[in-house]
Amino acid sequence: MNSKQILVIDDEDDIRQLIQTCLEIMGGWNVLTATSGHQGLLLAESSQPDAILLDIMMPDMDGLTTLQKLQANQITKHIPVILLTARGRTSDQRLFTQLGARGIISKPFNPQKLAAQVAAALK
């Protein structure tokens, strides 16, 4: 079993569970999940995962605000973050990269591409 740990932050149960299954089966990674940006920040700080998959569109604290807080925190700023988005415009992707995202995955996603992008972020 791979010892790498991935944190998935997404408010949609079905998407979060699908991503968790893909990462566990295809990558052999240990997966933690959070249902909100607030919960994700707490888990990221306490568990210090090797990578984070973060949904942009969430209630309360959206993914971009969560990303900025992760980047501003001395404990979590080194963790690579891959954003999950339904927004595929090039201008959005440029902004996400400028904010510190290591990668961007568009929804709906291909499970093989998801696992490959996580593997690349872990290198």
Per-range role (PLM):
Residues 13-32:
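Two-component/phosphorelay signaling modules centered on CheY-like receiver
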Residues 33-42, 63-65:
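Helix N-cap/capping motif at the beta->alpha junctions
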Residues 47-53:
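Active-site beta3 strand of CheY-like receiver
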Residues 55, 107:
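A Lys-centered signature of the CheY-like receiver
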Residues 58:
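Receiver (REC) domain active-site loop signature in two-component systems and cognate sites
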Residues 65, 88-105, 116:
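Alpha4 helix (beta4-alpha4-beta5 surface) of REC/receiver domains from two-component response regulators
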Residues 109-119:
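C-terminal output helix
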